Design a protein with these regions (language model features):
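A short glycine-rich, hydrophobically flanked beta-strand micro-motif that places a catalytic Asp/Glu
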Residues: 177-178, 239-250
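C-terminal active-site "lid" helix and adjoining low-complexity regulatory extension at the edge
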Residues: 221, 235, 248-287
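Short glycine-rich anion-binding loops that position phosphate/pyrophosphate groups of nucleotides
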Residues: 63-65, 144-145, 261
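Phosphate-binding site of ATP-dependent enzymes
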Residues: 149-237
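Short hydrophobic segments within beta-strands
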Residues: 7-10, 192
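Conserved N-proximal alpha/beta basic substrate-recognition cap immediately N-terminal to
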Residues: 11-117
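Protein kinase-like catalytic core scaffold
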Residues: 175, 197-198, 242, 254-256
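Active-site nucleotide/adenylate-binding loops and adjacent lid/helix of ATP-dependent enzymes
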Residues: 2-6, 53, 78, 83-84, ...
Length: 287
């Protein structure tokens, strides 16, 4: 009898979701894609949706970007799935921490992991005070988001005031992080459980180092220091499958964030390992 599992995703046609699905099918699994935004939750019999496939474990590849109320509901769905006995990788708790930049930074700091100085607030005047406190050169990020979307560097007081006042009118939360000089490059490391599997440099001609911002990949030989730092960072935010972003600075390595649904296409181009295979093998062996 074929084994069964689910992949939780915001887009079943996503290229990486398809690759991971095929890896599972090649191992004789029946795979169902669970898309939170299309799910109708029957509170009276929540198990019904899963009774036919009856998975023991599910792979989480994202719940999508949405207004706050919908995000909370989708996280609630993950909690409900775990409550009926399905183990999720990564867990609902992991997704909540890693996708919230405030919580992610806080958990890193609480675990004695070097991370840039950061202030989070709601008031525009407080945000300007934080801008000054951080030296007048900061990175302003959305509290939730990925791929570098919505990230802005503020290093001019007048421009900072305009941006902050505009966002204040839109009822946004301000996440302000000191700018770290990093020679327009950073490091991404893929962590699976207690192992750092692969890493790469991301290099750009500007301060943004996301692949979606045009950064190029370069192979990275993982040192023991980087391996240990990446694994500690993933554990700090309770994440089993993680993409850990690290910058080299004059203060040493600084962990910027931990991604709980890391992409692997770019990293695969500079790695001699089959990353989708590594991810699925970890996933299946983690039950």
């Amino acid at each position: 009898m074929k084994r069964k599992t689910i992949i939780i995703t915001s887009n079943s046609l996503d290229h990486e979701v398809q690759i991971l699905t095929n890896e599972l099918k090649n191992r004789d699994f029946i795979v169902k894609h669970f898309i939170p935004k299309r799910f109708i939750a029957n509170v009276s019999d929540f198990k019904e949706e899963f009774r036919q496939i009856n998975p023991k474990i599910g792979l989480v590849r994202g719940i999508g970007i949405a207004p706050t109320q919908k995000i909370f509901y989708r996280l609630d769905l993950l909690s409900a799935i775990e409550k009926i006995g399905i183990r999720l990788v990564n867990s609902r708790e992991s997704l909540e921490i890693a996708s919230d930049k405030f919580l992610s930074s806080l958990y890193l700091k609480m675990n004695n992991i070097a991370t840039p100085k950061t202030f989070v607030c709601e008031n525009n005047l407080d945000a300007m005070n934080a801008f000054e406190e951080l030296g007048g050169d900061v990175i302003l990020k959305p509290l939730y988001g990925s791929k570098g979307i919505g990230i802005t560097r503020l290093n001019d007081k007048g421009f900072a005031e305009n941006v902050i006042n505009t966002l204040y009118q839109l009822n946004k939360v301000f996440y302000l992080q000191e700018f770290i000089e990093h020679n327009n490059q950073d490091i991404r490391i893929l962590v699976l459980g207690d192992q750092a599997i692969a890493g790469m440099y991301r290099i750009n001609n500007c301060w943004k180092t996301n692949i979606h911002a045009g950064a190029k990949m370069k192979p990275l030989k993982l040192t023991e220091e980087l391996r240990e730092l990446a694994i500690r960072s993933a554990h700090a935010v309770k994440t089993e499958i993680a993409g850990v972003d690290i910058m080299e600075s004059n203060k040493g390595y600084q962990v910027i964030e931990v991604n709980s649904t890391p992409g692997f296409t770019a990293l695969q181009k500079v790695s001699n390992k089959n990353l989708s295979k590594e991810i699925i093998e970890y996933f299946l062996n983690s039950t």
